[in-house]
Design a protein with these regions (language model features):
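Ser/Thr/Pro/Gly-rich low-complexity disordered regions
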Residues: 1-115
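Mature catalytic domains of secreted/periplasmic carbohydrate-active enzymes
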Residues: 115-454
Length: 454
């Protein structure tokens, strides 16, 4: 072939790699594992790869006819029970930043996907028995129930300066004293203010014309989750992160104008509507960025708001950024990361999506009692999540000071729930200074005694 006929873009050494070799999920592909298509990319013009297209196919036999897996169009694929006994391969069309495409190439088929008993990804979660959660959120900090000294005064401090006050070593020491083996920490809910820097957020803020070269005022310069992850790791305590399934619906640039919600996220101002393509894309990009940054240090994600309207668009596999894409983004950087999607208070112990590793468990009253056994629907670890704080407020006690339950009730709940194979998360207020609510801390010490004393 003459030089002028050489393709501008090409790929070689195409193969499918099993990213999940631990916990009995390899070397053959197993349910709960993650596969990734690998190849060597080459551009004659030295341009970066951008916009490469992927499509996975499935067959009942290795040499049989393959059909397209609807909506499975990412570089990775999470293996589901539906794939057991079947063979997979991936079609790749590489592309550069100018839209030049390589010849489409298809990988060799994998070996048959094998069944996995239960869910070994959640073994650590089950063995932990109980953990804490915190609602460190701007919209909660502004509530009347937050002590005045803990509130943010935007006229005196930037959001970043406010978050800088968190004393991570002091906080980690207290958490360890409670006996909790993991923490679930909020990243953001509806305000659009994050406790960590996010490059993708900056990019889309600038694209919307709301931000120049200055730092994003709605994120902290400090990577608070990473600091907490590293400090808690010294005590053997893991960290998971909370984020809604949708973008923030009440993110204002100023004077409650909803401009960040509408112009950056293209989302429904003031309500949890169905997120459109752009809204889902941004959530995917945010989670993938954070997941890749934290890698195996980040143990899990709990996604809120997977209610009727958002679930409908995510579960439509004809859509871009569907539930398969969302789950793959959440496992970016760690194929063993566990995830859950919350469908509401009335369904604490069920598998809300095919990709759920543990149940959403939400019940602020801590009165939902699981049936015996670890798993819902064979492989979804059961979990109950409720509050310790005062419930005399519009937020049902989440992130609130004081107590709403007698200590004996809390202790008995912990013993009952964990004895049945479920995991328990207790929402505990933490101040911006990294201090746990003293009344709740006292209750947690009693929980520790009941669960771990011989």
């Amino acid at each position: 072939m003459r030089n002028e006929e050489k393709p501008l873009v090409s790929i070689s050494n195409l193969n499918v790699k099993n990213l999940s070799s631990k916990f009995g999920l390899g070397p053959e592909p197993h349910v709960k594992g993650v596969l990734e298509v690998m190849y060597k990319y080459k551009s004659a013009q030295k341009l970066e790869e951008n916009g490469t297209q992927y499509q996975w196919y499935i067959s009942d036999s290795k040499d049989g006819s393959y059909t397209k897996l609807q909506g499975i169009h990412g570089k990775t694929i999470i293996l589901l029970n539906d794939y057991v006994g079947k063979y997979l391969k991936c079609e790749v069309t590489a592309q550069d930043t100018q839209g030049n495409k390589a010849k489409t190439i298809t990988s060799a088929p994998t070996s048959a996907v094998l069944y996995t008993i239960g869910n070994p990804l959640t073994d650590w979660f089950y063995e932990a028995r109980y953990g804490l959660s915190h609602h460190l959120l701007k919209e909660f900090i502004e509530r009347d129930f937050t002590p005045k000294q803990d509130q943010w005064d935007a006229n005196k401090q930037t959001w970043s300066q406010f978050i800088d006050q968190f004393d991570v070593p002091k906080y980690a020491k207290q958490v360890n004293e409670t006996g909790a083996k993991f923490v679930l920490l909020t990243l953001n809910q509806n305000s659009g203010y994050y406790i960590t820097p996010i490059a993708a957020y900056d990019k889309y803020m600038r694209k919307a014309g709301l931000l120049g070269n200055e730092p994003n005022p709605m994120t902290s310069k400090r990577d608070l989750p990473l600091e907490i992850i590293n400090e808690l790791a010294k005590y053997g305590i893991k960290v998971m992160l909370y984020h809604p399934s949708n973008p923030p619906h009440s993110a204002h640039w100023k004077d409650k104008d909803f401009r960040v919600t509408s112009e950056v996220f293209h989302y429904t101002p003031g309500q949890n509507g169905a997120p459109g393509d752009t809204a889902r894309q941004l959530v995917n990009e945010f989670m993938a960025e954070l997941g890749e940054r934290y890698g195996e240090k980040l143990a899990g994600f709990w996604f809120d708001g997977f209610y009727k309207e958002p679930a409908a668009v995510y579960n439509n596999m004809d859509n871009a950024y569907n539930i398969a894409d969302f789950a793959s983004a959440a496992k970016k950087g760690n194929p063993y990361r566990i995830i859950a999607y919350n469908t509401g208070w009335d369904k604490q112990f069920h598998k809300s999506t095919p990709y759920s590793d543990f149940s959403s468990g939400e019940d602020p009253n801590l009165k939902a009692i699981p049936s015996e056994g670890r798993f819902a629907d064979d492989d979804c670890q059961k979990m109950l999540w409720g509050v310790l704080g005062s419930m005399d407020n519009p937020v049902h006690g989440w992130g609130c000071p004081g107590t709403s339950k007698e200590t004996n009730f809390v202790v008995n709940c912990a013993k009952t729930v964990t004895s049945r194979g479920s995991v328990l998360i207790m929402d505990t207020r933490v101040s911006v200074f990294g201090v746990l609510d003293p009344l709740q801390f006292a209750q947690l010490l009693e929980v520790k005694k009941s669960l771990y004393s011989k």
